[in-house]
C-alpha cells in the first residue's frame, strides 16, 4: 500500500503528464485515491490504517492495490481526476457540484459518499471584525482554493444572503489560496497579510487556542444546521468499469464509519498515527467527540449548495434532488 504526500509542484508535473497521455484506463483491482488535509478525512485515515479496501476486495475474490495521495485544493483534485491521474478524489460539496455540472454528458462525475458532517469556522485575528460586514479591502482571508473551494463557496452563500445575490463574489478579491496548515500558522503568528482564515477541523480548534483568534461565522450558520463537509467522487467510467473495486471501496467507507463511532478515542489515535500529526491527543479526542461533528457516509444538506449555486448562476444544471449527483450505492440512505 503506497502513500504519497504530494507537493503542489509534484502534483502539477503529474497533471501535465496526464494531459499528454490522456485518461488512463484502470483494470479491476486498482484504485488511486487522493485526500486533502485535516480531520475531515478521518474516515479515509481509518480505511487506510485498517486496510479495509483490501479486506472488502478479498471478500469479492479481488486483490486490490490501493495508491494513496494527498493534495491541497479542489482545483488540483479535479484536474487530476479528469486527466485520469487519479480514480477517486475528495473535496468539499461545492467543488464536487461544479465538476458534476461541467461533466454532465461527458465524464459524468458524481459523488460516492459523504466523509462526515462538521462545521467550518471563519476565523480572524482582527479585533475589529465581528461580522461579515466588518471585513474591508485591507483584510486577507485564507482559503484552500480561492473562489471555488468549499470555504469560498460557503462564504459566497452567506455573502449573497447578507449583501444580495449580485454581490456574492464580494470577498473573492481579498481571498488568498493557502493550505490549511500554512494558513493556521499565519493566523496564529499574526505577522503576515493573512488576518482571516476560513478554516476546518482540526485547524480551527488549534487556532482558537490562541487568545488573538476568534470565530466570525460557522458553516452550520450558513446552512441551517449540520451539513456534509467533504465528499468523495469519481467518474462514471471508473464506477461502471470497476464494479467490484467500487463496491469494496464503498463497503470500506461504511465499515470505517462504524469503527469510528464504536471507539472515538481509538479513532483519534488513528488520525495522529496516519497523518503523523503533532497535535496533542487530547485535542484530537475533543474534536472527534464534539457533538457538532458526525463521521457519516450519509450526505446532509448538500442540496442547499446545489440549489443556491444554480440560483447564483455558478451551476448551469439544476439538480432535482441530491440523488442526481450521487452514485446509486448511496441512494439507500436518507440523505439530503
Positions of PLM-derived features:
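Conserved C-terminal helix/tail region of periplasmic/extracytoplasmic solute-binding proteins
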Residues: 309-336
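Short, glycine-/small- and polar/acidic-enriched structural segments
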Residues: 29-168, 173-177, 191, 195, ...
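Bacterial N-terminal signal peptides that target proteins for export
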Residues: 1-12
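Short, solvent-exposed loop/beta-turn-alpha elements that line the ligand-binding surface or hinge
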Residues: 54-61, 221-224, 291-299
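Secondary-structure end/capping motifs
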Residues: 240-316
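Pocket-lining segment of extracytoplasmic ligand-binding domains
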Residues: 169-176, 181-272
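Bacterial N-terminal signal peptides
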Residues: 10-20
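Sec/Tat signal peptide C-region and signal peptidase I cleavage site
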Residues: 21-27
Amino acid at each position: 500500500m503506497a502513500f504519497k504526500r504530494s507537493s503542489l509542484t509534484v502534483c502539477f508535473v503529474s497533471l501535465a503528464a496526464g494531459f499528454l497521455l490522456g485518461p488512463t484506463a484502470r483494470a479491476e483491482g486498482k484504485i488511486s485515491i487522493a485526500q486533502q488535509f485535516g480531520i475531515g478525512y478521518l474516515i479515509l485515515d481509518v480505511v487506510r490504517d485498517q486496510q479495509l479496501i483490501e479486506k472488502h476486495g478479498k471478500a469479492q475474490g479481488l486483490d486490490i492495490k490501493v495508491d494513496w495521495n494527498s493534495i491541497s485544493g479542489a482545483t488540483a483534485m479535479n484536474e487530476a481526476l479528469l486527466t485520469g491521474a487519479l480514480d477517486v478524489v475528495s473535496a468539499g460539496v461545492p467543488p464536487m457540484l461544479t465538476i458534476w455540472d461541467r461533466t454532465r454528458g461527458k465524464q459524468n462525475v458524481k459523488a460516492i459518499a459523504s466523509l462526515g458532517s462538521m462545521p467550518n469556522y471563519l476565523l480572524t485575528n482582527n479585533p475589529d471584525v465581528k461580522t461579515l460586514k466588518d471585513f474591508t479591502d485591507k483584510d486577507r482571508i485564507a482559503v484552500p482554493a480561492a473562489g471555488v473551494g468549499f470555504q469560498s463557496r460557503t462564504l459566497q452563500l452567506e455573502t449573497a444572503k447578507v449583501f444580495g445575490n449580485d454581490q456574492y463574489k464580494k470577498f473573492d478579491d481579498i481571498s488568498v489560496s493557502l493550505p490549511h496548515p500554512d494558513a493556521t500558522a499565519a493566523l496564529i503568528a499574526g505577522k503576515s497579510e493573512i488576518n482571516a482564515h476560513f478554516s476546518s477541523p482540526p485547524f480551527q480548534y488549534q487556532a482558537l487556542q490562541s487568545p488573538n483568534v476568534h470565530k466570525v461565522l460557522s458553516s452550520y450558520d450558513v446552512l441551517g444546521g449540520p451539513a456534509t463537509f467533504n465528499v468523495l467522487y469519481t467518474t462514471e467510467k471508473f464506477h461502471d468499469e470497476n464494479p467490484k473495486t467500487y463496491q469494496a471501496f464503498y463497503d470500506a467507507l461504511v465499515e470505517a464509519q462504524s469503527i469510528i463511532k464504536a471507539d472515538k478515542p481509538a479513532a483519534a489515535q488513528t488520525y495522529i498515527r496516519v497523518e503523523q500529526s503533532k497535535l496533542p491527543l487530547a485535542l484530537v479526542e475533543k474534536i472527534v467527540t464534539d457533538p457538532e461533528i458526525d463521521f457519516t457516509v450519509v450526505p446532509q444538506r448538500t442540496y442547499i449548495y446545489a440549489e443556491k449555486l444554480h440560483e447564483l448562476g455558478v451551476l448551469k444544471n439544476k439538480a432535482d434532488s441530491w440523488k442526481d449527483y450521487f452514485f446509486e450505492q448511496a441512494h439507500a440512505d436518507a440523505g439530503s
